[in-house]
Amino acid sequence: MEKPIKPGRVTALACILMLLVIVFVVALYKLQIVDGKAYYEENRNSVASSQTVEAARGSSLDRYGHVLVSNTSCNNLVFNPDDLFEQDDPNGILLQMARTVAACGDTYVDELPVTAKPPFEYTDMNDTQRTQLKGFLKYAGLDEEATAVELMSYCREKFEINNNYSAADMRIIAGLRYSIKTRYIDKLYLPDYVFVQDASMELITSLKENNVPGFEVTVSYTRQYHTNLAAHLLGDTGKMNAEEYTTYKTQGYPMSATVGKDGAELAFEKYLHGTNGTAIVTKNASGTVTGTTYTKEPEPGDQVSLTIDLDLQAAAEQSLTRGIENMKSKSTETSDAVGGGALVAVDVATGQPLAIANYPTFDLQTLFQSQESYDAVKDAENEPLFNRALLGQYSPGSTFKPCTAIAGLTEGVITTGTRIQCTGTFRKYEDTGYAPKCWIASSGATHGNDNVTEAIRDSCNIFFYTVGDSLPIDTLARYAAAFGLGEHTGIELPESTGQMATEAVKKKVENTNWYVGDSLQAAIGQSYSLFTPLQLAEYCATIANGGTRHSASILKSVRSYDGSELIYENQAEVLSAVETSDYNWAAVQKGMYLVANDRAGSAYETFGDYGVKVAAKTGTAQLGDNQVNNAIFICYAPYDNPKVAVAVVVEHGSAGASIASIARDFLDAYFTVKTVDTAPESELSLLQ
């Protein structure tokens, strides 16, 4: 039996419904009648547009997760041409903006390559500025050879710049109008013009408080360097030029995209570059953003981990700097000649670079702060921007002798028991007028009757002249190539391949014939052989591990932006192998051990009492009359269980023995670092 509905409940329900209807009617009345006009005006003056949302670039880390490069967001000022040129005096507004920028201590991007004051002249231009100017001159109908004065005269007339403005103010206005105009010139492919990059809040507030029209504030990312180390490796980023755009546009890059310009930033662009998103942005009549709706979320770039160990990189740079500056400070006949240098350390088992140092170097954090700061580095003594470790090419000197030894042993020219008498002079071709001497002959001494191990210890030229005389130069070159000398190392950064001295190389360099003397000099690391410090380090690692040459890839791994997903992990890649017997390797390795541990060895003074047994070879690369020789040094350690191989080069360093202390200084740090935990507490904590 159904219960009867009580009259009180019906009344209450009716009252609630009536109240809801009244509220709805009042709200509708307010919306349509009271506020309707205001909403209409707001909607009529609102503008919705689809905008690109820049994706954050991925971070670069060292092998243990220390952050090397990441992002920081910044506010940029860009012009709104539609708004700007609706004003009565756009030129006056531009000048007002420029003055406000200066008053707030900010700087704006001035692209016009003309001096700030008369007499107007062109300033130095980079390739992008030159292309931009050429395109503008063509658009203006001016001759390519038009002077800066003619260009400024055209700008004053074209942009209707009042004659009441001073020449300096006219130049400011013309420069800004030039930057705006060139964005609309066909086929120039210029990125969007950013008036002020990383604008201060003082500047933004000042412009807004004074109701200055014609500009917008956008947010972008700039690279933040967390270290002043590895400047030649990390690289930098920037907006694309026209040539780069032709490459990247097929990959979906917008013209305004930031891309890697060199170093790891360029080499690993495909990982570091994120995918931009899009959003519908609504602005009111005053240009204030009133709403943002993402239609496609931006996808940040990936984390790239390099093989570099930040602690070892610091040690390498400090050791190299300390060693070279100490050499420069000594009052000797050769100290003034000491130039730049490089130190490279690689993992013996994998070939991975652990540290790549150059002297002199620079700081990426300050390099591009201004044109003046860049020019100061560019024009500094000994070319700090030059990556000697990868691009410098040096004769190896006696550090090449282990290669000659392996070639001679493997080809049967000598055995581990073969002894060759050092007489101070190689007399076989004396009747032709050619009789090269051993380095020790200048003191009236000889090395005696050396086997291959002792010859490496003594660096006896006569021994290696004899071996080289019995080896066809192409055979010796084949072994050099197997060691990676004169070959690509596999590193992803720009490098020189160098060259091994051969008949073909001499023909190319000097267009002259190959003589027996060339073969003898090539066997001791002179002649036309030129190798990079990175190649020498990998060569040393190949000796240490018994003949396996690995790629010098600098990429360790790639992870997703938040580190949660492993995208790529580098595996040691074998590029070539030097095949010979174990006892041949043992003989050569023992010879290098004696260089550092026998009193007759050239590196004994540095390593004789060292706590870790080191195998080494010194080299002196002769540069000709009246020039101080280059110093070359290679080593690996520990001798009985090789872990790290090191190559050091100092331009005009006189002799390899004189730079062995640089390698020892680095090894001190290496064996200290390896006894402690080098990883940060949390990889991801550094990226939050």
Predicted features and spans:
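Membrane-proximal periplasmic segments of bacterial cell-envelope enzymes
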Residues: 1-272, 276-297, 333-334, 338-342, ...
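Beta-lactam-recognizing serine transpeptidase/beta-lactamase-like catalytic domain environment
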Residues: 69, 75, 283-296, 308, ...
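Solvent-exposed, polar/charged alpha-helical surfaces in well-ordered, non-transmembrane soluble domains
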Residues: 91-95, 99, 201, 205, ...
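Amphipathic, well-packed alpha-helical segments that form the structural scaffold of globular domains
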Residues: 245, 273-276, 284-287, 317-325, ...
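Conserved, well-ordered alpha-helix/loop/beta-strand core segments that scaffold catalytic motifs
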Residues: 289-341
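Short amphipathic alpha-helical signal-transduction/dimerization elements
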Residues: 544, 596, 664-675
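Ligand-site clamp/hinge motif
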Residues: 650-653
